[in-house]
């Protein structure tokens, strides 16, 4: 009998990085479809523009580093970075903002650290935060859902506005965003926060047309439920683990419930927190980034809970309406510390 001796590892996982990235990309399709339904073709244009910009930026740096283009570009990480940034940008934001944010995410936040596997911060969230801080007005100007908007721009109109600032008929972005009386150009989270700071009671704010009698704002609850469906698909396939999404959502739900029970006139309800903004996109597609999140099971629970707490604090007391991007980046800083204190004990070690 012949015994063959091979080097470790003795168990192999056949899943390649490119396949995992593609599965995550496919899981975003339900959310993207719902965003298109409520917010129009501009969302699709921004996503496509961000993906092309991400791939071009990645190819440029790979060429400059004299690395094999096919293997590095074929891991689909740049595609996913562009997609996640594209879905986060308002549908009619200028094209150059998308290109700038995506290039910063890929070149500075990813490749400057050495490429995939070496970046300490989530590249898509770095690009988003850079745009949000640099261009706060453009980054918080969302179209009202098409169902209550006076004019719903078609595909050609969306292209004209994104690349030229006006539609073919001469309508500007401001005119398209006007919608109907009482409809602002902000998201439900932004509308609520701004109204509270102005002294309006919560009940009066939630009666505005942008909420449309929905649990978390017209359109936004369905967007979040669609991303939840995509996230459950990833969990069922074993592409991501449950620890981070569950701890994030549970912590956010607990904190928001306590705040709402104590002062419902000042704090959003837990359903509003869970089904508005980037909650479900963050829970299943952003926080679960294997490079920038914790690597131990206990650490993943701590990481998710920390992000959930930070999101609630930023939404409730901070200057920005959502807070998912800032919370993720702040938690990324703590990952080495979390992993250090939650690493499994070595067998036979005291």
Swiss-Prot record:
Principal location listed in the UniProt entry: membrane
Cofactor annotation: FMN
Membrane topology: Multi-pass membrane protein
Enzyme Commission numbers on file: 7.-.-.-
Modified residues (FMN phosphoryl threonine): 187
Highest taxon, organism lineage: Bacteria
InterPro entries for the chain: NqrB/RnfD, RnfD_bac
Transmembrane intervals: 20-39, 89-109, 123-143, 215-235, 244-264, 267-287, 301-321, 322-342
One Pfam family it belongs to: NQR2_RnfD_RnfE
One of the record's GO cellular component terms: plasma membrane
A GO BP annotation: electron transport chain
Alphabetic keyword roster: Cell inner membrane, Cell membrane, Electron transport, Flavoprotein, FMN, Membrane, Phosphoprotein, Translocase, Transmembrane, Transmembrane helix, Transport
Localization of this protein: Cell inner membrane
Family, similarity comment: Belongs to the NqrB/RnfD family.
UniProt function note: Part of a membrane-bound complex that couples electron transfer with translocation of ions across the membrane.
Assembly, per entry: The complex is composed of six subunits: RnfA, RnfB, RnfC, RnfD, RnfE and RnfG.
Protein name as annotated: Ion-translocating oxidoreductase complex subunit D
Name of the gene encoding the protein in the UniProt record: rnfD
């Amino acid at each position: 009998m012949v015994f063959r001796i091979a080097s470790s590892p003795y168990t192999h996982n056949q899943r390649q990085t490119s396949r995992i990235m593609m599965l995550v990309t496919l899981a975003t399709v339900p959310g993207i479809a719902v965003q298109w339904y409520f917010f129009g073709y501009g969302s699709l244009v921004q996503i496509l523009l961000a993906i092309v910009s991400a791939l071009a930026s990645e190819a440029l740096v790979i060429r400059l580093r004299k690395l094999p283009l096919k293997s590095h570009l074929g891991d689909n990480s740049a595609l996913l970075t562009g997609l996640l940034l594209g879905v986060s940008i308002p549908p009619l934001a200028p094209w150059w903002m998308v290109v700038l944010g995506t290039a910063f995410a890929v070149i500075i936040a990813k490749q400057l650290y050495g490429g995939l596997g070496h970046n300490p911060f989530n590249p898509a969230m770095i690009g988003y935060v850079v745009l949000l801080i640099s261009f706060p007005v453009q980054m918080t100007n969302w179209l009202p859902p098409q169902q209550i908007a006076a004019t719903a721009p078609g595909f050609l109109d969306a292209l004209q506005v994104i690349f030229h600032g006006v539609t073919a008929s001469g309508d500007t972005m401001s005119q398209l965003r006007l919608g109907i009386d009482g409809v602002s150009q902000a998201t439900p989270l932004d509308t609520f926060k701004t109204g509270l700071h102005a002294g309006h009671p919560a009940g009066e704010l939630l009666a505005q047309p942008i909420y449309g009698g929905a649990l978390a704002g017209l359109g936004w609850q369905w967007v979040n439920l669609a991303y939840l469906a995509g996230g459950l698909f990833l969990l069922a396939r074993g592409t991501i683990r449950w620890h981070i999404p569950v701890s994030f959502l549970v912590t956010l739900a607990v904190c928001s419930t306590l705040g709402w029970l104590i002062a419902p006139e000042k704090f959003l309800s837990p359903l509003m927190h869970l089904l508005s903004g980037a909650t479900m996109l963050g829970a299943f597609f952003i926080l679960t980034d294997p490079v920038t999140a914790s690597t131990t099971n206990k650490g993943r629970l701590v990481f998710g809970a920390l992000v959930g707490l930070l999101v609630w604090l930023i939404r409730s007391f901070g200057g920005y309406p959502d807070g998912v991007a800032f919370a993720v980046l702040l938690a990324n800083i703590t990952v080495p510390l979390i992993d250090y204190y939650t690493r499994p004990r070595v067998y036979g070690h005291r």
